[in-house]
Amino acid sequence: MKETRGDGGSAPFCTRLNHSYPGMWAPEARGNLTRPPGPGEDCGSVSVAFPITMLITGFVGNALAMLLVSRSYRRRESKRKKSFLLCIGWLALTDLVGQLLTSPVVILVYLSKQRWEQLDPSGRLCTFFGLTMTVFGLSSLFIASAMAVERALAIRAPHWYASHMKTRATRAVLLGVWLAVLAFALLPVLGVGQYTIQWPGTWCFISTGRGDNGTSSSHNWGNLFFASTFAFLGLLALAITFTCNLATIKALVSRCRAKAAASQSSAQWGRITTETAIQLMGIMCVLSVCWSPLLIMMLKMIFNQTSVEHCKTDTGKQKECNFFLIAVRLASLNQILDPWVYLLLRKILLRKFCQVIHENNEQKDEIQRENRNVSHSGQHEEARDSEKSKTIPGLFSILLQADPGARPYQQ
C-alpha cells in the first residue's frame, strides 16, 4: 500500500484547528493550541461544538427518514411502490453510516488536540478516512441518480415500469452501486491513486497533485487518473440526475395540459405537477450547490497540475485553498440535507408552499374569467368554492398507478 500521509511526519500545514466543520469530510484537529499562530497559520477559533452539531443534525434527519420509510414500506401492498421507498431508505442509510464512521473520528481528534501525524503515524487512519469519503460521497450521488431514473421510468414508461421494475431489481441496483463505488475507492490501496493529508493539514482526501519529486511517473499518473475519474463520475451522476428530473417534469407538465384540455381534474393535476416540480428542482439545486464546486475545482487543479498540498509553502494560494475547503464543506452538507429534500420537507413545507401558489393563481384566473364573462360570475363562484373544498393531494399521489410514491407518507 502506498504512503498515505501528505508529507510524512513533517510539521502540519496549519497548527491551529479550523473553526468550521465539513461533516464527514474533515477530521479537523491540530495541536499546538496554546501558542499564537504564525504567518498564514490563523485558521480560526477552535470549537468541538461544530462537529457535534453536524453529527446530531445528520443523525436525527437520516434516522427519522429511515423510520418513516420503514413504517411506510410495511404498509405498502403494491410492490411497485416499494421501489421508491427502498431508494430513499438506502440513501438515508448510506448518509447515516457515512456520518457514524467519520464524525466520531472528527470529535476524537478535536478533543485530543494533537497533530494528525501523532494520531496516525502509520497513515492507515488517513486511508480509511479518504476511502470512507469516496465511498459514501459517490454512493449518495449515484443513489440519487438511480432515484431520478426510477422516477422518470415510472412517469414516462408506466407499463414497462410496472412489468420490469420489481423490488428485487431495485435491491440489486442499489447494492451494485455501492459495491462498484467501494471497488473504485479501493484503488489507492492497490497502488492507483493516493489519499493524502489536505490543507490545512486537518483532513484526508484524494490527492490531485503529481506527488513529491521522488515519486515515480506511474505513481503520479495514478494520482491524476484516480482523482480525475472521481470528479468525472461525480459530474456524470449529477448529469444523469438532472436529465431524468427534467424529463420527469416535462412529462408531468404535458400530462397536466392534457388533463386540463379534457377537463379531468385539471386543478388537482396542476397542484400535483407544481408540487412535484418544486421538489425535483429543489433536489437539483441542492446537488448543484453541494457538489459542483468540489468536483469542478478538483478538475481545475488536475488540469493545472496543482493540489491543496502546495498551500503549506505557497502563502499566495491561500484564497484558492480556502475556497477548496469551503467546497468540501458544502459537499459534506449533502448527507444532512438529503433526508429533508427527499422526504421530510415534502409534507412539512411543499404542500403549504403549493397552496399559496395555487391560491394566488386561482384568484388571478378568477378575475380574468369574470372580466371576460360577467354573466357567468355565479358559475365561477361555485367552481371556486368547489376547488377550495378539495383536499390537496400529496406528492405523486395520483400521478400513475405505477408511480412508487403514489400517496404521501403517513406518520
Swiss-Prot record:
Residues 1-49, 109-127, 194-223, 304-323 are extracellular. Residues 75-87, 150-171, 250-279, 346-411 are cytoplasmic. Keywords: Cell membrane, Disulfide bond, G-protein coupled receptor, Glycoprotein, Membrane, Receptor, Transducer, Transmembrane, Transmembrane helix. The keyword Lyase does not apply. InterPro entries: EP3_rcpt_2 (IPR001481), GPCR_Rhodpsn (IPR000276), GPCR_Rhodpsn_7TM (IPR017452), Prostanoid_rcpt (IPR008365), Prostglndn_DP_rcpt (IPR001244), Prostglndn_EP3_rcpt (IPR000265). GO terms for molecular function: prostaglandin E receptor activity. Glycans are attached at N18, N32, N213. It is a multi-pass membrane protein. It comes from the Eukaryota. In the kidney cortex and medulla, adrenal gland and stomach. In kidney, expression is higher in tubules in the outer medulla, with lower levels in cortex. In kidney cortex, expression is restricted to distal tubules. One of its GO terms (biological process) is phospholipase C-activating G protein-coupled receptor signaling pathway. Residues 367-392 are annotated as: Disordered. Interacts (via C-terminus) with MKLN1. Belongs to the G-protein coupled receptor 1 family. This is Prostaglandin E2 receptor EP3 subtype. The gene is PTGER3.
